[in-house]
Amino acid sequence: MIPDRIIEQGTLRTDGPRAAVEVRLPWYRALPGSCIAGAELTIDGKTAPAESLRWEMNGAEFTFDELRTNIDEWWFPTDSAVLSGDLDIEADAEHEVTVGLTLYIPYIIISDTETLHIDEKNTKTMKAVAA
């Protein structure tokens, strides 16, 4: 619902074959990890392989399979999470970064078997910093 603030400007990092960027919750209320259904990280038109994606929040790192059942870790609108994936990018260069998020909103029921889900994307250009 607030897609223009998903990517934190100036947070693109590269560490060998991996790239990472800080992201913010595009929703106005906190969500448990189980509501983070998926993400996509694309830099300069190249998308990180889904199996390489990792999500870090509250000091812990997760695969999206691990998040699927996680109700103990919560993502708050005031906190940044880190999305990383296998993308070998050049440090000290400008890159176009796109992050896509799919979130489930558990308290908005839209049918007998379904809750609201939102798909949001944000693109920003920023310089990568070596980790």
Swiss-Prot record:
Enzyme class: lyase
Any single Pfam family the record assigns to this protein: CGDB
Superkingdom per UniProt: Bacteria
Cofactor(s) the protein requires to work: a divalent metal cation
Thermal activity characteristics from the UniProt entry: Optimum temperature is around 40 degrees Celsius.
Substrates-to-products reaction catalysed: 3''-dehydroisovitexin = 1,5-anhydro-D-erythro-hex-1-en-3-ulose + apigenin; 3''-dehydroisoorientin = 1,5-anhydro-D-erythro-hex-1-en-3-ulose + luteolin
UniProt protein name: C-glycoside deglycosidase beta subunit
Organism name: Microbacterium trichothecenolyticum
The encoding gene: carC
